[in-house]
Amino acid sequence: MKPQNLIIDCDDTLWENNRFFMDAHVRFVELMAGRGHDRARADSLLLRLEMENVPRYGYGAMSQARSMADVYRLFEPVPDEAVLAGIDAIGRAVFSHPVYMLPGVEETLPLLSERYTMVMFTKGNPDEQLGKIEKSPVKEYFSHVKCVPEKDPDTFRRVLEEFGMAPEETWMIGDSPRSDIMPALANGVKSVYIPFSMTWALEHQELPESEHIITLDAFHRLSEILL
Ligand SMILES: [Mg+2]
């Protein structure tokens, strides 16, 4: 049976996102290597600190930049202000990166919006996320936008409650097993998992076998099952 409501993830589901963070990561490692520091160590330290810092710094470009500054201070306990400014600039560039829609999204969303009530559901820094949403050409197709610090079963349940959406009448669509699919499953909501090659490592998780999870290889294929 088809649902009435669609809750749709934004980053790496509607538009490219993680590649900007990956590019910034590489720029930081090169910056450290250029100062004579070990490239592999800069790379692994940044990965580790980014994961460890999520509870303190949250998600997003400036959180990544703060982790870069932390790594830099491990290499140079007396930091150079110009290097710190350079790291800040890397973060700002990611913060306001251009929004490139993923293939099929702009063609499919208008069709879905004629039939479903749709919610954009995203996590991270509200200013950063809302900036991308404003820049995107698809905001008009959504009835609601919700940005939370973390996507988990509890925040997912609250979104259902806030918008008065019954679990059995709602589907979740996203690229992240951990942040999109598992929270939906925990709330009895069917989901469509659309894997993306550049999804952040921290978002990966083994998915259980479930009749509540449909996997598609491209966004436009939603029209095959929802229209
Ligand atoms: Mg995503």
List each model region and its residues.
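Hydrophobic alpha-helical core bundles mediating ligand binding, dimerization, or RNAP-core interactions
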Residues: A24-V29, L46, E50, I87-R92, ...
